[in-house]
């Protein structure tokens, strides 16, 4: 979905009925804003449409809506969806095959963005990077086309959702660390956090939601009422915020700060900002797509996106920004809800499945570490042990 304000001048000029010179072309956009709502099913656009009044409503009303635009990738998880979004590369080409998997070369589990050659900035431990991404992204191509004279920034709660869409040549990717209650980055991008990031973190935005009461934004006879109180502060609050609308509000506020500090839209070539709202995914996994909480998250992220679009209009003016909105994947109903509908299914913890594989192979071929690792797709078997038998 893209904002359509760029067409207005050309259409008005073409409508004039008297001869004149070649009409002036509309000004080129100065900023591309690529927005992902994590785990946002397409039917949320129509199911909750009557209650949208912010950014989603604006994009639906004034943008182009592509009802059948999708990639048929597997697995449908955050890392894969975010890597495809601005690269167009399927997992077999991008190298991003899951959120995490077993790397046979390293003989251990890795994540899509883990990188022990880097350090976390703003927190403790190894950093993250796009080094496992084998494809270029839109941001990389914009950097190449402008000979480096543009800015590319990625922002999200999750490291992979900030890093993978923004690509290799990004000027920075930032994500929220619940251990620190702050936005962090990696030495892959720079030696220390920019001053504006340190200033934002110093304001301790997460603490402002201590003891906040999350209640439905709009009542509905189809959904039950709920009340959820946030912890008072500290790490307990930071973790709880991730599965609440307040996390998206913090991400939006950080995006506004990035636009000003990085002068996005103020360079000779068009800049790019990739923003992923991840809190919807955390709530969806906990509560399921049929829940009142998921509905409320949709209505509230609509407001957050609307706030961001209004900020962009004030800073850059109408028609100078191209906005794209998509999701990285959807979600199936909770097994318990399916059971109520007399549908087959259920829950089976991954450990139970892996232990069953391990036990079956040990019983048939003898003791040994038969299962070397795992991913969403299944188990990785120990090839060396198999060869030795």
Give the positions of each predicted feature.
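Active-site-proximal N-terminal segment of extracellular/periplasmic enzymes that hydrolyze or transfer
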Residues: 18-64
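Short, structured active-site-proximal loop/turn typified by the sulfatase FGly-forming signature C/S-X-P-X-R
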Residues: 46-93, 151-155
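Active-site His/acidic residue clusters
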Residues: 163-172, 231-239, 243, 266-301, ...
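Hydrophobic h-region of N-terminal signal peptides that target proteins for export
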Residues: 10-19
């Amino acid at each position: 979905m893209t904002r359509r304000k760029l067409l207005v001048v050309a259409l008005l000029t073409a409508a004039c009925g008297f001869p004149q010179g070649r009409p002036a072309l509309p000004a080129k956009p100065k900023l591309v804003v690529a927005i992902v709502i994590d785990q946002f099913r397409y039917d949320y656009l129509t199911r909750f449409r009557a209650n949208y009044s912010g950014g989603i409503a604006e994009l639906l009303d004034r943008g182009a809506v592509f009802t059948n635009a999708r990639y048929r990738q597997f697995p449908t998880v955050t890392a894969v969806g975010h890597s495809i979004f601005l690269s167009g590369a399927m997992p077999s080409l991008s190298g991003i095959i899951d959120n995490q998997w077993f790397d046979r070369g390293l003989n251990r589990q890795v994540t899509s963005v883990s990188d022990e050659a880097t350090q976390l900035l703003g927190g403790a431990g190894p950093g993250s990077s796009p080094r496992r991404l084998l494809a270029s992204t839109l941001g990389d191509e914009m950097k190449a086309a402008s000979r480096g004279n543009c800015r590319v920034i990625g922002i999200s709660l999750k490291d992979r959702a900030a890093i993978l869409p923004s690509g290799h040549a990004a000027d920075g990717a930032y994500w929220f660390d619940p251990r620190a209650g702050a936005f962090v980055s990696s030495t892959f991008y720079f030696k220390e956090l920019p001053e504006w990031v340190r200033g934002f973190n110093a304001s301790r935005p997460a603490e402002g939601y201590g003891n906040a009461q999350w209640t439905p934004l709009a009542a509905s006879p189809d959904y039950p009422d709920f009340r959820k109180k946030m912890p008072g502060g500290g790490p307990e609050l930071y973790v709880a915020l991730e599965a609440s609308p307040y996390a998206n509000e913090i991400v939006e506020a950080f995006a506004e700060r990035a636009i000003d500090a990085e002068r996005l839209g103020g360079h000779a070539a068009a800049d790019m900002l990739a923003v992923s709202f991840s809190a919807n995914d955390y709530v969806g996994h906990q509560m399921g797509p049929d829940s009142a909480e998921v509905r409320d998250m949709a209505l509230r992220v609509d407001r957050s996106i609307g706030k961001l679009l209004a900020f962009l209009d004030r800073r850059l003016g109408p028609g100078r920004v191209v906005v794209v909105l998509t999701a990285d994947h959807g979600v199936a109903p909770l097994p318990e809800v399916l059971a109520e509908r007399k549908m087959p299914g259920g829950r089976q913890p991954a450990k139970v499945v892996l232990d069953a594989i391990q036990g079956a192979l040990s019983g048939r071929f003898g003791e040994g570490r038969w299962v070397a690792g795992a991913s969403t797709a299944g188990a990785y078997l120990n090839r060396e042990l198999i060869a030795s038998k």
